Curated annotation (Swiss-Prot):
Keyword Protein transport assigned: no
Residues reported in the UniProt entry to bind Fe cation: 109, 113, 130, 290
Localization terms from the record: Cytoplasm
UniProt organism field: Saccharolobus islandicus (strain L.S.2.15 / Lassen #1) (Sulfolobus islandicus)
Protein name in the entry: tRNA N6-adenosine threonylcarbamoyltransferase
Amino acid sequence: MLVLGIESTAHTFGVGIAKDQPPYILANERDTFVPKEGGMKPGDLLKHHAEVSGTILRRALEKANISINDINYIAVALGPGIGPALRVGATLARALSLKYNKKLVPVNHGIGHIEIGYLTTEAKDPLILYLSGGNTIITTFYKGRFRIFGETLDIALGNMMDVFVREVNLAPPYIINGKHAIDICSEKGSKLLKLPYVVKGQDMSFSGLLTAALRLVGKEKLEDICYSIREIAFDMLLEATERALALTSKKELMIVGGVAASVSLRKKLEELGKEWDVQIKIVPPEFAGDNGAMIAYAGMLAASKGVFIDVDKSYIRPRWRVDEVDIPWRN
């Protein structure tokens, strides 16, 4: 089985190709929109994705050394994400499905992150941290679905850091040589400032932390503010994670999503693993950020259980939660 996956939920347009036997991932091509200033404007994302979609599709097919006719199914991330960006990927997927008579497989973006994590880390039954620009979720698989044990009550961890560095003119670009701008700034900071620390059970809140940090700009060294906001945010996440580990008694902790690439977070998680006698499984950097390979792979798993969708019902779902998705391949 060969599945072509299309990712376009936010700033990245990606096309991946997966097959149902090793090495599983045959291609993983993408192009990421980087704004010249400010944040991501939906109209700019739509324009970028539309412009690069054809090139990325061709590159993926060339990388896999196959033609579109060799593909069995077309998988597409229908949500969650930014509406105009999602529509580009959905439109391309529908067109390919109709033109080449290929069944369409609906994929939840978060499930894509999680499943590529299972593949690349070889985790068996983990507690999962799904951390990205739009999501901060603590989850695990139980009785047919991924059940959420904790999440952000407002903005996501990645979004909070992106907004801060943008507001203080440290970004864009947000990622420089594999490091987030807040990590680079934090390297010269050492003073831990007093900022809000909000953990409620296994849920977290980052909006107050962001607001308080911005109010300190001009009053404290920027490097110390960056250091403090990062350390406090990560410590909040670790406290919520420890509570979930105590509740679930899991012996594996898997981290997926773009924030999983953070070296400083990895170090904290490794320490947590030693304290709790838990194996830490972190998705490789090349699969941490948004990519088409994760959509192709999750689509392949879904297709193996007959999960398809008619083209005329393939609506985008900008607020599609991971705990709303049935997972028949893990029953």
